[in-house]
Regions:
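A polyanion-binding, active-site-adjacent surface
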Residues: 2-198, 202
């Protein structure tokens, strides 16, 4: 399956009733600062360079970030942190990721998430993670030949990548690097959540 077909399938996904109801509710009720915006309020596809050597895996879209803008790590504090880091290392065209049509382009990098819908309290259930597993698994397979470095943001992303890749006995930690037998490098990091960045954890 090609990336464009996979992303179309993601957008149409209705496997998780709780998440479908939640993202629709958030899209209708909004928050005051975004009350005049039209929320995406659908599952969110991954994005970036289809021939990327750097694969970044996050947790899930944010309710008023990706769920609003239609692009993960866009329009929220986590997106600000990641966009700045990618720009400073030459992987992004600009240091900000505000909306789907802001001219922010990734170069040799691709960004995805374990769960494609924004979950309540940023915590997806085990069944929701399981339902989305097929999408991440396909993405990792599609990038098998080009990926050189994988960065997992948070333990959930780390655990799911290891499961898909058949990696055992690896332990999640912040700033931990694992050279893999296949030649790739796996880097685990805390997720750039507002709590982690504001408290200095990240």
């Amino acid at each position: 399956m090609m990336l464009d077909k996979l992303n179309e399938k993601v957008i149409q996904c209705k496997l998780c009733p709780r998440l479908s109801e939640y993202i629709d509710f958030i899209g209708q009720t909004k928050v005051k600062r975004f009350k005049n915006e039209n929320y995406w309020a659908k599952p969110i596809p991954s994005y970036g360079d289809p021939k990327a050597s750097l694969l970044i895996i996050g947790l899930a879209p944010a309710a008023h970030g990706g769920n609003r803008t239609g692009r993960i790590f866009t329009g929220d504090s986590s997106g600000d942190w990641l966009a700045k880091a990618l720009f400073e290392t030459g992987f992004a065209s600009k240091p900000t990721s505000i909306s789907k049509n802001d001219g922010y382009i990734l170069k040799d990098a691709y960004v995805t998430a374990v769960v494609k819908c924004a979950p309540p309290q940023n915590i997806p259930s085990a069944s929701e993670i399981s339902n989305c597993f097929q999408y991440l698994q396909t993405e990792i397979k599609l990038f098998e030949s080009t990926t050189k470095v994988v960065i997992t943001l948070g333990k959930l992303a780390f655990d799911n990548y290891c499961k898909i890749s058949g990696l055992k006995k690896l332990v999640f930690g912040h700033k931990v690097t694992y050279p893999l037998e296949c030649g790739k490098i796996l880097i685990s990091s805390y997720h750039p959540s507002r709590r982690n960045t504001n408290t200095g954890t990240l």
